[in-house]
Amino acid sequence: MTAHQAALEALTRYFGYDSFRPGQQGIVEALLAGRDVLGVMPTGAGKSVCYQIPAALSPGATLVISPLISLMRDQVDALNDLGLPAAFINTTQTPDEQAMVFAQAAAGQIKLLYVAPERLETGRFRDFAARTPISLIAVDEAHCVSQWGQDFRSSYLGIGDFITGLPQRPPVGAFTATATERVRRDIVGLLGLRNPAVTVTGFDRPNLYFDVVKLETKYKAAWVARYVADHPDESGIVYCATRKTTEALADTLNQMGHPAVAYHGGMSPDAREAAQRDFITDKVPVVVATNAFGMGIDKSNVRYVIHHNLPESIEAYYQEAGRAGRDGEPSRCTLLWNESDIVTRRRLLDNDYENERLTPEEQEIVRQSKRRLLDGMVGYCRTTDCLHRYMTRYFGQELSSNAGSTAGEDIAADSSQSGRCGACSNCESTFETIDVTRVAQAISRCVHDVGQRVGSGKIVKILRGSRAQDLAWLNPERMPTFGMLKDVNEARVRDVLSQMATDGYLSIAEGRMPIVMFGVRAAETAAPDFHYEIKRVERKSAAAGSGRSGGVADTADSANVPGDALGSYIPDDDEESLFQKLRELRRTIAQEIGKPPYIVFSDKTLRDMARIKPVTNAQFLAVNGVGQHKLDLYGQRFMQTIASFNAGSAS
């Protein structure tokens, strides 16, 4: 049997699939051939299968380095449920429990061993690794090794030395969902990958509907509550920037009768574990979390992710939003933002980064990098281009024809023309072009009048003729620009100022109190032929339901993902009824075995089951996601439910 045949056989036996997803086969065969690999694949594309198949086919243990221990138990449970012996070593175990795992791994009884990168630095683990055959090392979330990435973790810097120190170096696989070209180079260099086979699959997630809503902070909680109320049977994640907002929003949802749990780094380990358990077992449908929840979830049926605040980077947003729809089913990702979010993010960025492993100069380099990452995120909020295209271009790829929509619409080179992806709010909106030359020039002159010494709030007040007490020291009435824009809406002035900063006419000096200064293109605003426009969504969108209009009253429409746009299969009433019965059975089995429902079967597998309606072993194995081990464990109970349903329908 060739390596290719063996890999396909293992894929079918353990995972219930008869073919690999794009990119998987090449990575699997490279690792089986003893070659290092770097796999950059979107969340939900099956990165873990790329090292789990080689682990199943290799004689020794595969060491999986993963950043969050909160995820390990679920990963290990899922693998054991597939018939792949797996275990973890982390701080939740007693010394005796760890000793048992070490002994099992040394005896060849464990195929995959999960550890955090900090574990590699302990003498006990290094001794274990020196005397235990390790056939493969898989580094998950490999972007954490790079200071240029959005989630740098200094503990990852020791992985390369650990690998070098092994008596016999095994092939190494590094995997991530988010990595620009610069981050990829860091991963290869810092982990010491040797001539790796690099696989970068498309970054687009066509089953996700991307939505951007500009909304004042005071309206955000109502927007979220309305969305959750309209989707009572769906699992969702709501990300917030601070612990305080996280707890307040979770309390608000609960008070309104929408069960939700909070999750953030300030909670005790037991409280975080309980919150995560309630969410992944479907006991509570919604988790409101800070980014501490970012890599700690492996739940396949999350139907929506809402960002209550602006994320720190496109990488962070892509990864967090990517928690939705991991099973390939249509899901929605909504970003709520406003100008205050940008100011808050910049302040957090400047005040929140310290690392004892780095010199002050290196820390400043990291800060500058993170400022550039934030600029990319702000650009995502303001673009009028296709949001799928913006995302893929950011990662260095062009959106191909048919990408961004599984319905198969062709996307033109410019989404403002005929091509619309059908899976983002920009492509479902009509934008109007507004001439704001006078506003832009007035702003630029006012920045000059105040000597580049104040923030955007004071600039706006002066231009609109405010005599507020906090302006007295500036004596604004003597300035030529005082009251120059008193006829312009305050929100419009703020909007133009912010857009000018994005376009380089202005810059925002970083610090505790951000100051508006001239940007690299400032001189252009004084030119006789200077012309400046902004694009804003019209109140009536091209397709009803765009969240771009930003009003709470629009929430009911904006909550609906167009099924035809996402190419989703629409089941008939019988299939939907059977699907719900299969979900109930899955929940019952999950409670009996004490595991999350998605570990039994994913929603996608249950959908396929409801469509095929298998009543024999052969038919059951034909369902996507059903392998022999799952058939042995659960097949009879599911087929009995299907047979009973068929009998009832026939009568």
State the predicted function of each range.
Residues 1-7, 90, 343-344, 349, ...:
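Accessory DNA-binding and partner-docking regions appended to nucleic-acid-acting proteins
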Residues 243, 348-350, 357-404, 408-409, ...:
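Cys/His-rich Zn2+-binding cysteine-cluster or related metal-binding knuckle/ribbon modules and their
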Residues 3-14, 18-22, 26-48, 56-58, ...:
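Helicase motor core with emphasis on the C-terminal RecA-like subdomain
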Residues 168, 232, 384, 452, ...:
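Flexible coil/turn residues that form the inter-helical turn or adjacent wing/linker of helix-turn-helix
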Residues 30, 307, 380, 608-609:
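Short alpha-helical segment immediately N-terminal to, or the first helix within
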Residues 12, 32, 254, 392-396, ...:
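Amphipathic, well-packed alpha-helical segments that form the structural scaffold of globular domains
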